[in-house]
């Protein structure tokens, strides 16, 4: 499996953010069963499954084991995996993070934090290149306070656009065909930012969180992956397989028509 294959699939990404309080007296068992059923039902309609690492880490060792089980099951279903951990560190620590996710699961992707600089990102880029994976660098995130740093004007241009231009240059060496293995996270809640990043980084896959519960609206364009977590995993605020299928169909219709 090569992660870039996700870009030829339907553009919807299922965000898996399990909350044990919504899963009854045996939450781990119910999370496992519900997620496997949901993945199997939605797989043909998805580009990838995105696992938010914090929600599994919060469940302790059993949660980490469940993460690996669900990620492995996704791959067996032919569904690419995104590990949403926003990792970032220097040197050997970045290399260790890359081994933990990109090399342990070849063909998968990882979200990373650029605050430490491009040199701290290169171990992730190199691991993705070796393993057929991908990297999504935080650029313009979907949260309301993202502008505190990301919108700071530097030489008349917001910081996130400086980052986008630098990543497009760096990503050229990791490009295969029309797409680079170096992508970016840009919130669907900021459609103007999506357009500005795409203009400056035409070869970068863009992971767009915020569709659904956060109010981000569907956008058109190639190389866009729209992540929906609460709207798909917990439609109506609770586990509901039938409602999740209906929500996926509605989102896909809005995305592709």
Swiss-Prot record:
SUPFAM superfamilies per record: Ribulose-phoshate binding barrel
Protein EC: 4.1.1.23
Keyword Transmembrane attached: no
InterPro entries reported for this sequence: Aldolase_TIM (IPR013785), OMPdecase_AS (IPR018089), OMPdecase_type-2 (IPR011995), OMPdeCOase_dom (IPR001754), RibuloseP-bd_barrel (IPR011060)
Pathway where it operates: Pyrimidine metabolism; UMP biosynthesis via de novo pathway; UMP from orotate: step 2/2
Keywords recorded for this protein, A-Z: Decarboxylase, Lyase, Pyrimidine biosynthesis
Pfam short name (any one): OMPdecase
Presence of keyword Mitochondrion: no
Family: Belongs to the OMP decarboxylase family. Type 2 subfamily.
Name of this protein: Orotidine 5'-phosphate decarboxylase
Gene: pyrF
